[in-house]
């Protein structure tokens, strides 16, 4: 039995989101193909993920014997909790829109909890080495324009998850803002792709 972590990176519901429509279709198809697997869901917009602000970063570099505030201790514990949640999953699926050429800020904060030295990668004399080998990561993204996987959001997500050694792949639905009349056609193609991916993911 494997564990799938489902990461919702959109502030709205599937009624207003093509990426979440794809995510819902993926999860439904995945459950049918892998009925014994455990599925855990994470909504980054309601999870109160700590951001890398002054309070958190200063706590990270304070040292073992430093006196931390209760708030700093809480942020460190919650940050580590999201790291461990990612590590405990065998597979991860992430769905998000592209906002201003990038992923939403809340999703970026979650990604920061995933990219952790000593946990998901390590430094060696030959350079950094990923520690998340064998972990499958599927990225579902909706782009209003057509970017052909060359948008900064895709490049960033690919760079991070390849850096930590995971088996990263992406399925995008794009062009619906450029040509709204084709939205249903584009969505149908997207759904077909994610349902097919779910069979063997």
Swiss-Prot record:
Query: What's this protein's function?
Result: Quinone reductase that provides resistance to thiol-specific stress caused by electrophilic quinones. Also exhibits azoreductase activity. Catalyzes the reductive cleavage of the azo bond in aromatic azo compounds to the corresponding amines.
Q: Which UniProt keywords apply?
A: Flavoprotein, FMN, NAD, Oxidoreductase
What's the protein name?
Answer: FMN-dependent NADH:quinone oxidoreductase 2
Cofactor(s) the protein requires to work: FMN
Q: What class of enzyme is it?
A: oxidoreductase
Q: Which GO terms describe its molecular function?
A: electron transfer activity; FMN binding; oxidoreductase activity, acting on NAD(P)H as acceptor; oxidoreductase activity, acting on NAD(P)H, quinone or similar compound as acceptor
Q: What is the lineage of its organism?
A: Bacteria, Bacillati, Bacillota, Bacilli, Lactobacillales
Q: Could you tell me which InterPro entries the record lists for this protein?
A: Flavodoxin_fold, Flavoprotein-like_sf, FMN-dep_NADH:Q_OxRdtase_AzoR1, NADH:quinone_OxRdtase_FMN_depd
Keyword Transit peptide assigned to the entry: answer is: no
Q: How does it assemble?
A: Homodimer.
How is the cofactor bound here? Binds 1 FMN per subunit.
- Organism, by scientific name, is Lactococcus lactis subsp. lactis (strain IL1403) (Streptococcus lactis)
For this chain, the family text in UniProt reads:
Belongs to the azoreductase type 1 family.
Its recorded reaction(s) are: 2 a quinone + NADH + H(+) = 2 a 1,4-benzosemiquinone + NAD(+); N,N-dimethyl-1,4-phenylenediamine + anthranilate + 2 NAD(+) = 2-(4-dimethylaminophenyl)diazenylbenzoate + 2 NADH + 2 H(+)
- Per UniProt, what is the name of the gene that codes for the protein in this document? azoR2
Annotated residues that bind FMN are located at 17-19, 98-101
Q: What is its EC number?
A: 1.6.5.-, 1.7.1.17
Check the record and name the SUPFAM superfamilies matching this protein.
Flavoproteins
Xref: Pfam families = Flavodoxin_2 (PF02525)
Key word Disulfide bond present:
no
